[in-house]
Regions:
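Juxtamembrane intracellular "pre-TM" segments in multi-pass secondary transporters
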Residues: 1-9, 188-209
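Substrate-agnostic recognition of the 12-TM MFS/MFS-like secondary transporter fold
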Residues: 10-27, 50-65, 69-84, 101-159, ...
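MFS-fold secondary transporters
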Residues: 35, 87-92, 109, 182
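Extracellular/periplasmic helix-loop-helix junction of adjacent transmembrane segments
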Residues: 28-53
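Short helix-capping/hinge motifs at transmembrane helix termini and TM-loop junctions
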Residues: 39, 62, 91-96, 163, ...
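Membrane-helix interface segments
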Residues: 7-8, 40-43, 67, 97-99, ...
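Helix-loop junctions on the cytosolic side of multi-pass membrane transporters
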Residues: 95, 122, 126, 168-200
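C-terminal ends and interior cores of transmembrane alpha-helices
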Residues: 79-96
């Protein structure tokens, strides 16, 4: 496929795949770990709610993503997710892991995702010719839906075989790999310069969509 010969698109596409793998592994491992630590289905339900809630707030991130450097946004979001996810196995190792800590980290990681995915979508038309956008979007849809379905299905098996903590270590590794892939991107110069965003301008941009 010719589109995959485009170095920048390939890096972005691979990053998209690893991001989705990381998100899927994290969600299933988190649900399982919360229940294991608490033994209470209420906390599992609360964890699911807190993880899904930020996706309803994605529209609030748009004005920031539109102004920030795409490459910086892509890299920083992955680094932050990597660090936050890694806190889980580290605190577990020192016997400091609690349900409360998980319930704090989960929505933060999920909220960071709301900056990562729009930035990826915004980068796509900057890296592809107009004639390649349809193929590019199709591959991105596969990476988002197909990989998510596969990984969510396999995550339950992996949790049973490896344990949630090991899965968190693998998960943090996927975000680290993605950060390196995005760091290697060569974005057009004009996308590397962000502008400040006043409160008034933020709400104006939010209203305009």
């Amino acid at each position: 496929m010719d589109i995959l010969k485009n170095r920048n698109f390939l890096l972005l596409f691979l990053g998209r795949i690893f991001t989705n793998i990381g998100d899927s592994l994290y969600y299933v491992a988190a649900m399982w770990l919360v229940y294991k630590l608490s033994g209470n289905p209420f906390y599992s339900g609360l964890a699911g709610f807190l993880t899904l809630l930020p996706s309803a707030l994605q529209f609030l991130t748009g004005p920031f993503v539109d102004r920030w450097s795409i490459k910086n946004t892509l890299v920083i979001t992955q680094v932050l997710q990597c660090i936050l996810i890694l806190i889980i196995p580290i605190t577990h190792y020192f016997d400091l892991l609690t349900v409360q800590l998980l319930l704090i980290i989960m929505p933060i990681v999920a909220f960071i995702e709301q900056f990562a995915y729009p930035a990826q979508s915004k980068a796509l038309p900057l890296l592809l010719h107009k004639t390649q956008l349809l193929k590019g979007n199709s591959l991105f849809s596969f990476a988002y839906q197909g990989i998510d379905l596969i990984c969510t299905t396999l995550s339950g098996i992996l949790v049973a075989l490896l344990g949630a903590i090991t899965l968190y270590v693998v998960d943090s590794l996927t975000f680290a790999i993605t950060a390196l892939l995005f760091f290697s991107l060569r974005m057009p110069k004009q996308t590397e310069t962000g502008t400040s965003l006043s409160t008034k301008q933020y709400f104006t941009d939010l209203k305009e969509g």
